[in-house]
Structure formats: structure tokens, C-alpha cells
Amino acid sequence: MEDVREKIKAIEEMIQVVLLAIPREISAHAYYLNASQRATSDMSRNLFLSLAEQEKDHEMKLKHIVEELKRELQNCKGSLREIKKQKVQ
């Protein structure tokens, strides 16, 4: 049972870390998008647009990771409930 509790704690910590990273990706996306609008050449504009797109991809990947971690967290919590239920019986 203790190993399940430790896994739950680890997953919760991972979720918090990833949730902290998402706003940074959003901010970076906005930064590069703004830079692309101020760019003075097509080459630099395209570079900044590419970087902005990459930051948006990072944001989406992180959101997907959070959803996967939340599913895993629910599975672990369900396992913990089952273990507790079996101990009572």
C-alpha cells in the first residue's frame, strides 16, 4: 500500500511541475509571435513563426501529458481504495 501512496505522491508532483511549465510555453509562443510581427525580413519572420509554432506544440504536448498523468493518478487512487477495502475484509 505504501508503494501506491508513493506513486500517487510522485504523480501529483509531476502534474504540478508540468502545470507550471504550460504558462511558460504560452508566454514563449506570444513572445515569438510578437517578434515575428516586428521582424524586418522574411527570414527572421519565418524563424520567429516557426519558434512560435514549436512553443504551441510544446504547450499541447504538456497538456496531453497532464491528462495522461491524471488518468494514471485516478487508477492509482482506485487501486489504493481496493487495497484498503481488502484490508477491512
What residue spans do the PLM features occupy?
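Non-heme di-metal
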Residues: 1-89
